[in-house]
């Protein structure tokens, strides 16, 4: 338990470590590893979790639960293996609200989706959701725009009027947090003008494997409409994703979706590398709509898989295998299938060369620290001998 009487800053996320749904957890893990240790004011990580029985039981697998009957801090849910103080918003908000209230500064590392989900279940207004954080927001990092993600899925899926209203609330809530943040940060590759800073994610190519001699298509991503999983209906493929979501997500699609030859490899964060090391797939379905960064794209390239990219992803990069429709995607699979291993390796090397601009962990770290370690006009970075000003 932290000393609430000493100065500390709060950083809020929704995923970390084994509690993972995708790219946000990877970003937070990198933040904990590379940024947290260089913060000049003690950091406290808050993990927002949906407060229902299912989530409580899920999270209990990975955290320590400390019970102090009769105390003001009765329950403490924490992941002890993390190198910084951390607390989960379970079994209720009492503990984390107390920590947030006493913080010197308050930063959002990602969009707090669980608050929106809980608020919608209670039919809260956007204004009431915002009041969960009864304080100034010093910075907010955005990993994807709800306005783009939700509007895209509305093209494919049928929703009730009530559900569409909830989605609009999510768009409005995210926009409110961006507007209220003293500093807003976009983590994507392409510039979004509504943000104060553009600090793209980082991925360091460490494997640089040769191309895999297989024409099976791999899908290493979540089952959500903008990932365009339905492009694989007629393709020999394997998907590293949630089987439960896969079995249910297409029920309300406007057009029938039927897969002829797809294997589902159940997603687990501890099996990510194992999936990429499989040699029975060599083409990566990386054709995602509105993809801000795309860890799975970088990972596919790192592990020797030829990606099929969306036409709008990293548009300045010359690359022939791109698509926006299922028909175009199938055509690109056929084109890649004709390539020799030598040609595939040439494409992979060119991709790695261009994307190397996003591999500097130190640059990424220092750009974030220039925000978190700022006090007035003074900033301390790890290259300095000592903090420029005591805070």
Could you describe each region identified by the protein language model?
Residues 70-73, 251, 259-276:
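Conserved active-site histidine-acidic residue motif and adjacent donor-binding/catalytic loop
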Residues 14-29, 225-227:
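A short, glycine/small-residue-rich beta-strand->loop->alpha-helix junction that serves as a flexible
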Residues 284-296, 311-319:
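Nucleotide-sugar-dependent
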Residues 302-310:
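Short hydrophobic beta-strand element within catalytic cores of glycosyltransferases
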Residues 26, 338-389:
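A charged, aromatic-enriched C-terminal amphipathic alpha-helix characteristic of glycosyltransferases
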Residues 10-13, 203-227, 233-239:
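Conserved donor-binding/catalytic core segment of Leloir-type glycosyltransferases
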Residues 112-114, 146-148, 167-172, 187-208:
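Short beta-strand->alpha-helix junction loop in the catalytic core
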